[in-house]
């Protein structure tokens, strides 16, 4: 009997697929483990260089002045990200909030934001003012900031000629590394570099801004090391390692990070304020563990992609592809299959496993969404989770996985509930 069936009731045909997938995935698992080892040693070196001590994890209250623990964590982030400086704060509520702070920090009335990799994902549309519902709520457009975009080509690659044409009129060039709700691969670092080089050749003063959500530690470099001026991400995704309870980060050029700090706090205050309360230990520990946790999440993705491919689905990316974020997307085919897949992920989660996800409205999204997230941290996507909008072709987005053993069990149960019903 498979060890899996000691704990969950899987059908023989599902276990047969599992056995084949595990064999096919081994070379790709080993590749990710090599990336993990490189990034973990880079992380260790950054901690040592900063001379972080146990007292740096104690936290501060009130204004948070002279918080050496906060300063050292930001120094570690900057070194690991290949950046001059970083802003790492628990006051960032989500990836969208962190992106909004950064964009408002960089842009002024009359400036133009160029989305060089097509329309950003749904929640950022509201920040910009593209969804038509937020007029008067303080969007970028409300403040006289213009928006332009270079749509992706039919094959989901950047349109470099269009970027060259549009970059001279823009102050910020926005690159979204992950796919959002598109069935494309995440952009690799070579593509990010080419977009950055193309925009900068047309406008040497343009600021290259990368939404790095879901992409940290999937490769041995980060976007600042290939031409980005600023990168932004969330601590309840990759860099929090499943341990950081909240927060986000902005890293890059020192002058730009300072502008973002003025927006988060107040002009004249910048990075000097922001108490850390009881969060430093979890933020330090989560970041330290992040390379290993991201490896487990990518191994989960590789395994899920292989299983889905054996079922005749067409996941993006494929298990044998290079991985540049932790997300897998595939067309579930029907609403029932999408809901069943999410319910299977939820049933094999450590938290709220008894819940059965159902479609419901979600702030920032135009369609009802079904979402599974049995996570220790609410909304965490480095923990195994999946979601999808209730619209044809019922595309499902799977991400995360703190450890492969448990995530494998969840993927199997999801596939069984979606495609092997009695």
Where are these predicted regions, by residue range?
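Extended, compositionally biased flexible segments
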Residues: 71, 77-82, 90-91
């Amino acid at each position: 009997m498979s060890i899996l069936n000691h704990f969950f009731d899987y059908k023989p045909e599902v276990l047969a697929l599992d056995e084949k997938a595990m064999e096919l995935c081994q070379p790709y698992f080993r590749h990710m483990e090599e990336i993990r080892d490189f990034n973990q040693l880079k992380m260790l070196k950054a901690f040592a260089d900063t001379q972080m001590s146990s007292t740096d994890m104690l936290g501060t209250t009130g204004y948070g002045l002279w918080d050496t623990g906060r300063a050292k964590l930001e120094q570690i982030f900057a070194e690991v990200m290949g950046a001059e400086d970083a802003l790492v704060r628990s006051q960032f509520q989500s990836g969208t909030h962190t992106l909004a702070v950064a964009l408002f920090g960089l842009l002024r009335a009359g400036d133009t934001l160029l989305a060089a990799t097509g329309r950003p994902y749904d929640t950022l549309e509201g920040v910009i003012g593209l969804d038509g519902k937020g007029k008067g709520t303080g969007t970028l457009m409300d403040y006289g900031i213009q928006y332009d975009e270079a749509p992706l080509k039919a094959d989901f690659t950047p349109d470099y000629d269009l970027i060259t044409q549009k970059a001279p009129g823009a102050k910020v060039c926005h690159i979204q590394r992950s796919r959002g709700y598109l069935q494309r691969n995440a952009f690799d670092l070579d593509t990010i570099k080419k977009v950055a080089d193309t925009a900068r050749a047309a406008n040497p003063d343009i600021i290259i801004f990368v939404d790095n959500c879901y992409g940290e530690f999937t490769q041995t470099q980060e976007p600042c090391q290939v031409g980005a001026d600023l990168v932004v991400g969330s601590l309840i995704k990759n860099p929090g390692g499943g341990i950081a309870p909240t927060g986000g980060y902005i890293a890059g050029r020192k002058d730009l990070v300072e502008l973002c700090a003025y927006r988060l706090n107040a002009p004249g205050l910048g990075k000097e304020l922001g108490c850390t309360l009881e969060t430093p230990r979890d933020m330090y520990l989560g970041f330290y563990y992040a390379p290993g946790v991201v490896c487990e999440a990518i191994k989960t993705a590789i395994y899920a992609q292989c299983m889905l491919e054996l079922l005749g689905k067409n996941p993006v990316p494929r298990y044998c592809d290079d991985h540049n974020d932790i997300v897998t997307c595939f067309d579930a085919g029907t609403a029932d299959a999408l809901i069943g897949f999410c319910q299977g992920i939820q049933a094999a989660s450590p938290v709220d496993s008894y819940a059965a996800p159902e479609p419901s409205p979600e702030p920032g999204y135009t369609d009802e969404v079904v979402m599974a997230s049995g996570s220790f941290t609410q909304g965490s996507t480095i923990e195994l989770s999946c979601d999808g909008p209730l619209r044809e072709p019922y595309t499902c987005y799977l991400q995360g996985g703190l450890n492969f053993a448990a995530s494998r069990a969840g993927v199997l149960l999801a596939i069984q509930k979606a495609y092997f019903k009695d």
